[in-house]
């Protein structure tokens, strides 16, 4: 550490102030900068001891009693409640919209909370200056004003999880305690805080990683780069507030030029002098507003920054050392406070909050006078009051109570809330200036919902019917007006119901209003269940009379099937139980007989297979009477064991009872066929039959067919059929069993009910489940054909189904089988909607067991009146509903006239507070219904103010229910999407992202002239200095932030929104190229954008009160703006689209000038930090960051070399890093090895091949950059310089 003992340190001054945190900081900074670290830390230790000593002696402690709530709080809350009550009254009179009411409520509570905060401070200062809480918060020891406000003021407004502010404030503080409601609202904010912190930590960490990657190779490598450029520093101002003062920006910088006193030209600071506190103070005292200093942005040291351009190392308060890794320090300085930045702020849903507009308060009690020639526009303020906007700058006269004039200056665009000759009180808000900032507004909508049911009446509404391209029409208000809801009880009635009443009828409670009739769609017999919820109609019925079911509900199980026993003794197994649904052709029962049972497995063949195929369905083939089935027996054993375990051989004859494998025996004699797979025996098949040599038999039949044995063996006398097969080369004759199928004679006696639909039938069928030629693998036998009892439907309904019923037989334990078809009719209790459920009554007009015909009436559902009243309106709309409105007694109110002259007539709409007769005023809003001698009867009504441009959702005289949407109000609010706060905004700037909705930028300097506009767009003209005009089309979703006749600079925003930095860079570059050289215009345009980026990042951090030195941001921005994009390579070897360092391409172009070649053209580009990291010279660094495969592949294809200039590359391959002591080590090594002075040699790597360069000279240029950066491959301008360290 450098201790400064070259001069006598100044003696301490006596600071006659209360030493709080701020003063303590100053004291420590003074000690540190004048006496060095050792003494400063000793002094800090002593101050700490002093503090603890006296805190102990004073017994400073915190108690609940120290939380003093200022008594004025009660009055402030009363005043706020009064204001809100007035707002509510205005809303009830229909003088402000729901949005204006919300905005006013929010602003009222915000202002109250702020006033209370000020009162808390004032109260502590005046009454209890030694209060421990006050001492702690205001000395900077612990806590801040916002926490103190929550403890003893009021907690204020909170936001819900969507970020919308809840208009119910927390009026209590933590000292008084919160109510349950307040506690719940309060917990929203707490949860949001936790979630935000968790997200911030991750985002901030990733930001730091990207910053480190982009700046890691920036090291202080030389003392002075000799640059001819500097940057101008002045106060950083935003919204007329100084964010960072010039004084703070100057400390630790190096002067670019000698600075003289404005009065007597004596020197304040010399060129290349670093600015300490004293010099900075003297600069500020002289009134100098801007100073040119050296900056990393303008440093010309290649791939590094020089000592002078960087300035102080802020940790030491002296010039930065050579070899300091300033890139890493910059990255950490920007990344570390990231966690302190908020992610997103709350938005009010209003136009803009008080912070974005500066309020003008009256300096005294008085009156205002407007001049006659005042150019103003009358507007409606965000609170629904009338205000005026000044179109020019004016000095207006305000008079105090003594008549003395004072002139106040108001800027153009100021909104004034008071009219000509209006009186005002001291401290009253008389106007506000909208801060000229990049405040983006967007059109937002809010539903206007009715708080009561009733009839809609339009008054003063100017409506336009707009039809879009799809032909949909929308009603839009051109001018604001009132929507009245005349109160009444509205009933929604379906279109298919009858209304029993007419308009004007007087109605008692429970009068039937409307009836819905339920009609039968079927003939049949009615069946009702106990609850009468569902009516069933029996449409068909069949009963099996000659069979009985043996059935006991208690012991029904799968093993013991239910039997259906016929009178002739035949038994069917029933395959269904009561409650089952039966579809067409479904099996009900299965007949048990052994006529068609085989003894073993085999192959099945049908005689008339072509006929059977027609009868096939999902449940198998229906077998007709006298059909013949052929059966070729074979015994199949599934083995799945190793071949070595088999006890028999393939194609050998075995007798029945032979052991196949252990404990498995064959049941039949025959030839063996073994089916195996990979030494595993899958199956063993035993086929009975006789083998013949094919030469002995002369058969013309094909293998695999059935034929008479005589056709094959002419000598045979047997009359039987065989199946032709082969074993190896030999013919194998297999026996065939034939089954002649006969229909089972099961007699079905059925009984039906008359006059029902004839749908159901019972039928007995034979079915086989096997295909022709199917091989059935089995050892034991199976049934080839089964006899089934099935149900047949004579109906074309595909979804028809029948129910199974077991009907008990009288005086018996047995049952009869019944099949029924029933249709359900559901009674529609919700026909009048869920809202009317309590007023719906249903009555049945049928009985259980009654026979009914199609279109007979089954039930009537009545909607009855909830209250007595008068039927005022019946509305039949096209949307399949009818509505009617009943005016009840509670929907009217009476006002006695006290014999005064009546000032209203029947049908008039009266607002709350309006005069009715003499001094009689309306206690509620309403419509005059009837006027008698002594009183006026009014029907309650509610006026709603609808602003211009609103979309109406209902028509005039329509009937609405409570909570129906009347209109969609369109309003402007500050855009939350684009005022991205905190971390996301920092990321957006540093990644050089294009904003979603960028503002329009002026393409040249000039004067603005606003011209014609229509609904969709506005056209403005920019007249430049040469008189040329440029037209800009502004969409209606963008707002102009400049006024007519205003002068604008190049790339200045014309509309609201964030500028696109890429567009800004292009505008500057295109403008400068027409005036100066390509290199200079690239430098200048980049410098403009650099300044913008630095300021933008600072604004975000300053808004959260985080101080970061400019130089850190400048180091990062330098890396983002160091490259250009080649447009045309000229005679160089550069390719179009290639990204090259600006300095490097300029060196190449200079070399081209010497060889009279065509230089390359290029344009500057702005890279985001991620892109800049990936485009770094070192592929090792880029690959270790992101997209490893792509980076390494491209580097390999291009044959890139990594010069190991940065820290990261050296760390990765395990070398000493070229920073700190490593920097000096490499320097020493370089000094000893450097024996010859390098001469200026052009860079052949980039020049065209026509230029010849000696290899020996080139090899001396391409040295390890860790030795010294002057010999880098593309630093021509420094090649002739001596190393300043030599």
Swiss-Prot record:
What CDD domains does the database record attribute to this sequence? RNAP_beta'_C
Per the record, its GO cellular-component terms are: chloroplast; DNA-directed RNA polymerase complex; mitochondrion
Q: Which keywords does this chain's UniProt record carry?
A: Chloroplast, DNA-directed RNA polymerase, Metal-binding, Nucleotidyltransferase, Plastid, Transcription, Transferase, Zinc
Would the keyword Cell inner membrane turn up in this protein's UniProt record? no
Cofactor: how and how many bound: Binds 1 Zn(2+) ion per subunit.
GO terms under biological process: DNA-templated transcription
Q: Which InterPro entries match?
A: DNA-dir_RpoC2_beta_pp (IPR012756), DNA-dir_RpoC_beta_prime (IPR045867), RNA_pol_Rpb1_3 (IPR007066), RNA_pol_Rpb1_3_sf (IPR042102), RNA_pol_Rpb1_4 (IPR007083), RNA_pol_Rpb1_5 (IPR007081), Rpb1_funnel_sf (IPR038120)
Q: Binding residues for Zn(2+), per the UniProt record? A: 225, 299, 306, 309
Known EC number(s)? 2.7.7.6
Name the Gene Ontology molecular function terms of this record.
DNA binding; DNA-directed RNA polymerase activity; zinc ion binding
**Catalytic reaction(s) noted:** RNA(n) + a ribonucleoside 5'-triphosphate = RNA(n+1) + diphosphate
Q: Which coenzyme or cofactor does it need?
A: Zn(2+)
Name the Gene3D superfamilies for this protein.
1.10.132.30, 1.10.150.390, 1.10.1790.20, 2.40.50.100, RNA polymerase Rpb1, domain 3 (1.10.274.100)
Localization terms from the record = Plastid, Chloroplast
* Entry keyword Zinc: yes
Q: What does this protein do?
A: DNA-dependent RNA polymerase catalyzes the transcription of DNA into RNA using the four ribonucleoside triphosphates as substrates.
- Stated family: Belongs to the RNA polymerase beta' chain family. RpoC2 subfamily.
Supply the NCBIfam families for this chain. Answer: rpoC2_cyan
Q: List the protein's name.
A: DNA-directed RNA polymerase subunit beta''
| Native source species | Guillardia theta (Cryptophyte)
């Amino acid at each position: 550490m450098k201790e400064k003992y070259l001069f006598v340190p100044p003696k301490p001054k006596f600071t006659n102030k209360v030493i709080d945190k701020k003063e303590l900081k100053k004291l420590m900074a003074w000690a540190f900068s004048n006496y060095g670290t050792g003494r400063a830390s000793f002094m800090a230790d002593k101050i700490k001891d002093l503090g603890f000593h006296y805190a102990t002696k004073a017994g400073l402690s915190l108690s609940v009693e120290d939380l003093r709530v200022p008594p004025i709080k009660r009055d402030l809350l009363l005043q706020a409640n009064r204001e809100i009550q007035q707002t509510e009254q205005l809303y009830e009179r229909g003088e402000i919209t729901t949005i204006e009411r919300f905005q006013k409520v929010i602003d009222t509570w915000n202002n109250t909370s702020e006033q209370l905060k000020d009162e808390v401070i004032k109260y502590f200062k005046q009454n209890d200056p030694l209060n421990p809480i006050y001492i702690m918060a205001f000395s900077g020891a612990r806590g801040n004003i916002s926490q103190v406000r929550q403890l003893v003021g009021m907690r204020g407004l909170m936001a819900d999880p969507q970020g919308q502010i809840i208009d119910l404030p927390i009026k209590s503080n933590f000292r008084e305690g919160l109510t349950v409601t307040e506690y719940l609202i309060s917990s929203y904010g707490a949860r949001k805080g936790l979630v935000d912190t968790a997200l911030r930590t991750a985002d901030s960490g990733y930001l730091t990683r990207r910053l480190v990657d982009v700046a890691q190779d920036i090291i202080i490598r030389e003392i002075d780069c000799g640059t001819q450029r500097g940057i101008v520093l002045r106060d950083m101002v935003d919204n007329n507030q100084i964010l960072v003062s010039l004084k703070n920006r100057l400390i630790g910088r190096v002067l670019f030029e000698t600075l003289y006193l404005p009065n007597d030209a004596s020197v304040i600071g010399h060129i290349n002098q670093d600015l300490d506190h004293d010099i900075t103070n003297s600069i500020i005292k002289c009134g100098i507003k801007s100073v040119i200093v050296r900056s990393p942005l303008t440093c010309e040291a290649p791939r590094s920054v020089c000592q002078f351009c960087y300035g102080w190392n802020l940790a030491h308060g002296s010039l930065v050392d050579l070899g300091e890794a300033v890139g890493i320090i910059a990255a950490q300085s920007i990344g570390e406070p990231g966690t302190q930045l908020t992610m997103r702020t709350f938005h009010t849903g209003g136009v803009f909050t008080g912070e974005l507009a500066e309020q003008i308060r009256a300096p005294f009690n008085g009156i205002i006078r407007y001049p006659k020639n005042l150019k103003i526009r009358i507007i409606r303020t965000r609170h629904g009051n009338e205000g005026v906007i000044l179109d020019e700058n004016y000095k207006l006269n305000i008079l105090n109570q003594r008549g003395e004039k004072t002139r106040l200056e108001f800027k153009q665009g100021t909104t004034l809330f008071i009219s000509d000759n209006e009186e005002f009180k001291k401290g009253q808000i008389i106007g506000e200036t909208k801060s000229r900032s990049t405040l983006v507004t967007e059109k937002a909508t809010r539903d206007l919902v009715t708080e009561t049911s009733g009839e809609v009446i339009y008054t003063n509404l100017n409506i336009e019917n707009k039809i879009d391209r799809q032909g949909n029409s929308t009603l839009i208000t051109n001018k604001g007006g009132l929507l009245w809801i005349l109160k009444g009880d509205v009933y929604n009635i379906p279109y298919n119901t009858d209304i029993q009443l007419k308009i004007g009828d007087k109605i008692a409670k429970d009068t039937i209003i409307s009836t819905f009739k339920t009609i039968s769609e079927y003939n049949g017999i009615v069946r009702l269940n106990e609850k009468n919820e569902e009516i069933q109609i029996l449409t068909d019925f069949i009963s099996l009379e000659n069979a009985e079911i043996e059935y006991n509900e208690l012991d029904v199980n799968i093993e013991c099937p239910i039997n259906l026993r016929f009178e002739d003794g035949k038994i069917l197994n029933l395959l269904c139980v009561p409650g089952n649904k039966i579809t067409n052709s479904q099996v009900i029962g299965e007949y048990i007989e052994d006529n068609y049972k085989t003894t073993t497995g085999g192959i099945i063949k049908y005689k008339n297979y072509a006929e059977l195929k027609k009868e096939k369905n999902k449940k198998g083939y229906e077998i007709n009477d006298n059909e013949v089935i052929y059966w070729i027996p074979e015994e199949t054993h599934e083995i799945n064991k190793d071949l070595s375990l088999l006890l028999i051989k393939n194609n050998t004859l075995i007798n029945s009872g032979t052991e196949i494998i252990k404990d498995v025996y064959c049941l039949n004699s025959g030839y063996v066929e073994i089916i195996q797979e990979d030494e595993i025996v899958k199956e063993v098949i035993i086929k009975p039959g006789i083998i013949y040599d094919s030469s002995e038999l002369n058969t013309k039949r094909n293998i695999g067919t059935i034929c008479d044995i005589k056709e094959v063996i002419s000598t045979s006398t047997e009359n039987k059929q065989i199946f032709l097969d082969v074993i190896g080369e030999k013919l194998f004759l297999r026996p065939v069993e034939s089954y002649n199928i006969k229909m089972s004679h099961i007699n079905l006696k059925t009984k039906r009910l008359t006059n029902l639909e004839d749908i159901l039938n019972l039928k007995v069928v034979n079915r086989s489940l096997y295909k022709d030629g199917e091989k059935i693998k089995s050892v034991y036998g199976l049934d080839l054909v089964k006899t089934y009892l099935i149900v047949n439907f004579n109906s074309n309904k595909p979804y028809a189904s029948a129910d199974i019923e077991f009907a008990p037989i009288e005086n018996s334990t047995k049952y009869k089988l019944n099949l029924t078809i029933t249709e359900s009719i559901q009674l529609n209790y919700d026909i009048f909607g869920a809202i009317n459920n309590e007023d719906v009554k249903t009555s049945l007009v049928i009985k259980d067991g009654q026979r009914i015909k199609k279109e007979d009436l089954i039930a009537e559902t009545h909607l009855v009146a909830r209250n007595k009243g008068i039927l005022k309106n019946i509305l039949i709309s096209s949307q399949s509903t009818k509505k009617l409105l009943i005016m009840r007694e509670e929907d009217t109110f009476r006002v006695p006239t006290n014999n005064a002259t009546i000032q209203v007539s029947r049908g008039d709409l009266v607002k709350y507070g309006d005069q009715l007769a003499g001094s009689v005023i309306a206690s509620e809003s309403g419509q005059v219904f009837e006027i008698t001698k002594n009183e006026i009867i009014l029907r309650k009504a509610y006026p709603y103010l609808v602003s211009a441009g609103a979309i109406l959702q209902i028509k005039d005289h329509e009937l609405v229910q409570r909570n129906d949407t009347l209109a969609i109000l369109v309003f402007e609010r500050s855009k939350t999407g684009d005022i991205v706060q905190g971390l996301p905004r920092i990321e957006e700037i540093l990644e050089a992202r294009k904003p979603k909705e960028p503002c329009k930028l002026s393409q040249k300097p000039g004067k603005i002239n606003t011209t014609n506009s229509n609904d969709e767009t506005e056209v403005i003209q920019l007249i430049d200095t040469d008189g040329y005009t440029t037209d800009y089309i502004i969409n209606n979703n963008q707002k102009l932030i400049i006024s007519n006749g205003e002068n604008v600079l190049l790339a200045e925003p014309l509309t609201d929104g964030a500028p696109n930095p890429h567009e800004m860079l292009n505008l500057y570059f295109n403008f400068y190229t027409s005036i100066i050289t390509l290199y200079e215009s690239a430098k200048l345009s980049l410098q403009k954008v650099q300044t913008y980026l630095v300021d933008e990042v600072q604004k975000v951090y300053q808004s959260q009160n985080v101080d970061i030195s400019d130089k850190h941001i400048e180091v990062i921005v330098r890396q983002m703006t160091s490259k250009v994009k080649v447009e045309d390579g000229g005679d160089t070897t550069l390719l179009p689209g290639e990204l090259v360092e600006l300095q490097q391409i300029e060196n190449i172009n200079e070399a081209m000038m010497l060889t009279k070649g065509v230089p390359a053209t290029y344009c500057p580009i702005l890279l985001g930090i991620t892109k800049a990291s990936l485009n770094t010279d070192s592929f090792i660094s880029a690959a270790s960051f992101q997209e490893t495969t792509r980076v390494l592949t491209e580097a390999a294809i291009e044959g890139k070399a990594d010069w190991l200039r940065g820290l990261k590359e050296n760390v990765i391959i395990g070398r000493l890093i070229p920073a700190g002591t490593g920097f000096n080590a490499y320097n020493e090594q370089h000094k000893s090895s450097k024996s010859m002075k390098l001469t200026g040699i052009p860079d052949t790597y980039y020049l065209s091949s026509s230029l010849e360069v000696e290899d020996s000279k080139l090899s001396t240029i391409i040295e390890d950059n860790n030795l010294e950066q002057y010999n880098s491959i593309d630093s021509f301008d420094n090649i002739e310089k001596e190393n300043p360290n030599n």
